[in-house]
Amino acid sequence: MGLPLPLLQSSLLLMLLLRLSAASTNLNWQCPRIPYAASRDFSVKYVVPSFSAGGRVQATAAYEDSTNSAVFVATRNHLHVLGPDLQFIENLTTGPIGNPGCQTCASCGPGPHGPPKDTDTLVLVMEPGLPALVSCGSTLQGRCFLHELEPRGKALHLAAPACLFSANNNKPEACTDCVASPLGTRVTVVEQGHASYFYVASSLDPELAASFSPRSVSIRRLKSDTSGFQPGFPSLSVLPKYLASYLIKYVYSFHSGDFVYFLTVQPISVTSPPSALHTRLVRLNAVEPEIGDYRELVLDCHFAPKRRRRGAPEGTQPYPVLQAAHSAPVDAKLAVELSISEGQEVLFGVFVTVKDGGSGMGPNSVVCAFPIYHLNILIEEGVEYCCHSSNSSSLLSRGLDFFQTPSFCPNPPGGEASGPSSRCHYFPLMVHASFTRVDLFNGLLGSVKVTALHVTRLGNVTVAHMGTVDGRVLQVEIARSLNYLLYVSNFSLGSSGQPVHRDVSRLGNDLLFASGDQVFKVPIQGPGCRHFLTCWRCLRAQRFMGCGWCGDRCDRQKECPGSWQQDHCPPEISEFYPHSGPLRGTTRLTLCGSNFYLRPDDVVPEGTHQITVGQSPCRLLPKDSSSPRPGSLKEFIQELECELEPLVTQAVGTTNISLVITNMPAGKHFRVEGISVQEGFSFVEPVLTSIKPDFGPRAGGTYLTLEGQSLSVGTSRAVLVNGTQCRLEQVNEEQILCVTPPGAGTARVPLHLQIGGAEVPGSWTFHYKEDPIVLDISPKCGYSGSHIMIHGQHLTSAWHFTLSFHDGQSTVESRCAGQFVEQQQRRCRLPEYVVRNPQGWATGNLSVWGDGAAGFTLPGFRFLPPPSPLRAGLVELKPEEHSVKVEYVGLGAVADCVTVNMTVGGEVCQHELRGDVVICPLPPSLQLGKDGVPLQVCVDGGCHILSQVVRSSPGRASQRILLIALLVLILLVAVLAVALIFNSRRRKKQLGAHSLSPTTLSDINDTASGAPNHEESSESRDGTSVPLLRTESIRLQDLDRMLLAEVKDVLIPHEQVVIHTDQVIGKGHFGVVYHGEYTDGAQNQTHCAIKSLSRITEVQEVEAFLREGLLMRGLHHPNILALIGIMLPPEGLPRVLLPYMRHGDLLHFIRSPQRNPTVKDLVSFGLQVACGMEYLAEQKFVHRDLAARNCMLDESFTVKVADFGLARGVLDKEYYSVRQHRHARLPVKWMALESLQTYRFTTKSDVWSFGVLLWELLTRGAPPYPHIDPFDLSHFLAQGRRLPQPEYCPDSLYHVMLRCWEADPAARPTFRALVLEVKQVVASLLGDHYVQLTAAYVNVGPRAVDDGSVPPEQVQPSPQHCRSTSKPRPLSEPPLPT
């Protein structure tokens, strides 16, 4: 039924409006964006002053006054004094105790000091009053030493140490001068008047608290005679009952205003597990050193992808553990964002989720800011809430139960006197509100693990200096309003890559970072400018960095040998489009690059930009503001557009593009000025040579192909048919494809091609003819590729007809093109269509139309599967038989749709169809010779010779009987020879004369080796030896020289290989696999499996074997069997060395009755296979023979995909030979439907085989399609039939199998998708569901007995993303009784 012409024209017009033509694709070209990361290079190496301390740095301190400065570095048993440039001054020995050379030990008197022990420095702080350096170590009960600073010459030195310890005031149960704890101690020194107060916090445990223990928190006053600390100091300590379970880690301490603060990481409560941690802030009064002012507050730091300024929004990720911290004043801009005044101090902290800083989904580290002003307000409000009687609740706890007796607000801790001094404010308190902040950098630190932090204010910006776990320093501007990091620098401190120490010291305008055994001095303004690669990025750097443009690089002025400036940048052209244009026409040229203008919204002033291409000027076009490109935070680009106009003097050829910018107004950072030249633009002359077809229907829709040279030059082109544009579909250098518009009538009209507005020379016409009219289609059924006949009028007017079949869900199309002479009928082929309907056919609408003319639709068209012939070989007819019977699968169903002809010996026979059986009566005149005659069947014009027909005779039967008798006799002789050889070899072994020549491979003995017997032939099931065929010697010089050169990289000398010929791992059709050892050049011995060939005698087959071995050379994956090497003996055949797989192949493993895997075990095996196949697919490698028998299991139960065609054993029931390929044997029951039909293999055919492998696993090795003959399998699958769901198979996994078995390869999943789907199945399996081994599935040889002798082993997790998270269970362990 045809479509009305007005409706058709409306549809064409709508398509024309909606569809983007090729003419506009040039205009839509966009400049490739440049990543911002390309403007900097963080791999640039900077050399900063450093000092190697000879041991891991434990602490650093710095001192500076108006005249002198020094750096102090503590390591185990040593305290180094350095100058301001880290030059060595002197060294003080601090241990081991008991060593006569210990200088600090000697200052405490002769001792005794206990057994010799190394001293680790735990505290290193400056006492500002004297000035002096105070150090506290891990020995001598954690006592401290005072080192006064003495100027000597131009450097500072340490005076003799003073021991801050008085024996009379210190006892095991109460030690006044015990300060440092081996578990960690933090000290802040506050000077009040002429006294120095030490605010000390130490971590404690039961062992440390038993004798000479410091206190958890204490405020100590230094004695004026520097003999120790005043006794009776205020302190708090963890109660004895919580010492073992409640460990407080003190991370950082600082003095700000009237208070001293400590930051701790500790358990959430005394009842929570030790792993449930959070961070707290401790505040003590620095004006009145009283412990009653002790306050604690919880600090919460979160990461939220979409930051919310207040609170901890739902769905954010908490980061409870503090890693490092520092307090500093901030600049005005950041102060506004933090709701504080400029210059106020802010506490910055680096937080992580777990100990190692890994956070799983979010970044590894986050940075939060806590204004000190807001912290104090929150603490004061908490105190008032507890102590004000009208607000306090009887249920509000005072907290700090690990320090004091539990009590409720406003009461003091239990047992305290209720006098004037017992007021609520004068006792330690835990503020129950928490202070919550979100990540300042909004997750932009990503995978960076920050270990150190120091914050400085530099002019109008605040910079965070961060050390990382891999020994790098990041200097980043802090700004909450940005969604990207403003780097000052990002560089490596050295080659060691060790974590940066948490504590950072400042000396003038430099910071001291410690990493490993080194200390580095890093300028706060950054180590340099060379990591900025572009001029614009260089001049946009913060002014405190002092960066400027030095010719072609960014540098500081003192480091620039030539011209250095900070005021302008030249333009840079990185790309342009198009690369060629017509000599006669105009071209719209787009320039891409940077420094064309200062801001994207800038209007280019007139006269500032001059563009020339060769000799031709290019007129600058105004920016198109109607369709601005979306901006990106990670990339940028600037564009200029100009129109290149033709110039008479311009010549054909390649020339340069020049951009000159002058007199541009200056911007905030710099101005744009200079010249940029880019070569590579070509002027060409387009040529049109042919147009086809030159006719079409009046309705239009004809696809015209214009051929010539240089047809894609420039940016605009148009094909005009009688003045109307032909819609462009495709444009390339040599062709233009367009669709003709409707014509006014039947006539020959002019056709022109315009490029760049100029007409291409030539005289061309197009002939509009009468529209074709389709009246009918016959026959009413068919199959993919079969012929149908189109009937109608004016059918030669259309260049091509489109056939479309729609089954209600999907549509397939094909084109029938060419010039035909028949006006009233046209023969075309049906499109490719796969019948998936279980009933064996599909019904739908078959439509046909010619070019843009009205179409015709035939409803109820029946699509059938294509018939497939079965080759019968030789057909013998008895003397009394006069007809031939052959089977042609599916022919009966399509017999009414196509023509069928049958010939015997070239003579036509009047055949008869009975279903799929074709009966051909022999013509009386036909003579059957002794060689027979061919039987040929032609279906729809395609002919196949199915067999040779011969006449049976008595002589032929006698010959058959004689042949059978001869074969039986040969078999008996062979059996006798086997027995004689076996007895002879056993006798020689008993006599101790065991020797084997390389040329006597036919005498190999198959004794049990304890290793799995890999693939056994039917002749060796009883364990007796099987003689191998004697092979002719193949010399190395017989092989291809290029192949030998390629193999040389993996060649292994035969002297380094020992082959245990009495330990046969497996035997197959092509050879034997032995157990052996390989000794490499370092004398490391490796157990391996050695594959040899025995049935290959041709040089070409040996070369093919070597090429398949080379395929494994570049494959490296935990689930792929690796190649150790290839050995070429002086004589004989090559051998391949592979890793020894203890548990043999996967098929024998799952079939073994001694194994008892769960469903989860079996599916996990499948997951590992999918991981290996995902890797093979990424390497563009097609396996072609994926099955359980070709997967191996090593000692850790890791599955390895193997057998890529190397000397593979052949199982007769699982392989069959293809006649066209003499040596090819195919695993038909694992092959995809399209591979069975075309013998072509792809990654999607491997996906089909993977589905069969999953089915094997869940049935524990059952043979697929056990009742289907291999030759009938293709027809079986084409009907939509598949393997049934195994008994223990989850529905979700069977759904995965069915997706692997889709008839359409494009509908099957990729191996990457399969890995994710099978992982979900594994994750959903709970409990132990054992797959029982059905008796029908058991088909194992003697090696199954070997499996039973293997002791139970744990299944270890497999590598990478194939690892199982469940608890391993021995696969050899029987299930528990239920």
Swiss-Prot record:
Q: Which cysteines are joined by disulfide bonds?
A: 102-105, 108-163, 136-144, 175-178, 301-368, 386-409, 387-424, 529-547, 535-569, 538-554, 550-560
Q: Where is the IPT/TIG domain?
A: 571-673, 686-769, 772-864
> What residues does the Sema domain cover?
33-524
Q: Name one GO cellular component term.
A: vacuole
Under the heading InterPro entries, the entry gives:
Ig-like_fold (IPR013783), Ig_E-set (IPR014756), IPT_dom (IPR002909), Kinase-like_dom_sf (IPR011009), Prot_kinase_dom (IPR000719), Protein_kinase_ATP_BS (IPR017441), PSI (IPR016201), RON_Sema (IPR039413)
Q: What Enzyme Commission number(s) does the record list for this chain?
A: 2.7.10.1
Taxonomic superkingdom: Eukaryota
Q: Name one GO biological process term.
A: response to virus
Cytoplasmic side: which ranges?
982-1378
Question: How is the enzymatic or functional activity of this protein modulated?
Answer: In its inactive state, the C-terminal tail interacts with the catalytic domain and inhibits the kinase activity. Upon ligand binding, the C-terminal tail is displaced and becomes phosphorylated, thus increasing the kinase activity.
Checking SUPFAM superfamilies in the record gives: E set domains, Plexin repeat, Protein kinase-like (PK-like), Sema domain
What reactions does this protein catalyze? L-tyrosyl-[protein] + ATP = O-phospho-L-tyrosyl-[protein] + ADP + H(+)
Per UniProt, residues of the Protein kinase domain are 1059-1322
Q: In which tissues is it expressed?
A: Expressed in liver, skin, lung, brain, testis and kidney.
Task performed by this protein: Receptor tyrosine kinase that transduces signals from the extracellular matrix into the cytoplasm by binding to MST1 ligand. Regulates many physiological processes including cell survival, migration and differentiation. Ligand binding at the cell surface induces autophosphorylation of RON on its intracellular domain that provides docking sites for downstream signaling molecules. Following activation by ligand, interacts with the PI3-kinase subunit PIK3R1, PLCG1 or the adapter GAB1.
* PANTHER family (alphabetical): MACROPHAGE-STIMULATING PROTEIN RECEPTOR, TYROSINE-PROTEIN KINASE RECEPTOR
The protein depicted here goes by the name Macrophage-stimulating protein receptor
> Which organism does this sequence originate in?
Mus musculus
